[in-house]
Amino acid sequence: MSKEIVSTPNAPAAIGPYSQAVKAGGFLYLSGQIPLDPQTMTVVPGCVACQTEQALKNMKAVLESQGLTTDDVVKTTLFIKDMNDFAKVNEVYAKYFAKDAPARSCVEVARLPKDVLVEVEAVALCK
């Protein structure tokens, strides 16, 4: 089985020794997306809803670079700084996964890169 490294300028560049995504075995494995503006590489300021929106936009950009959509996502993992924000995160998340939502885990963590409030990781089925 071979693997293909995926990179797009429409999503933030990796801030460490990892790829934006890797395609292997018929799946696209997306690294965690945080709310960075892809052009400036700065954290999008504001509330958890604003940061969730940007993280999901970044995820969508990586998917679209491979001809995929959120409909192709089979699993997501959300990392949030405060579980009290769960409802706010869900409200934004539901706009991206309105029907046939993927399997999902949501974990509260002590700290995320660049002290953001949310990170989104995904696995998508390639066409």
Predicted regions and their residues:
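Short, polar/acidic, helix-capping and beta-turn segments at strand->helix junctions
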Residues: S2-K127
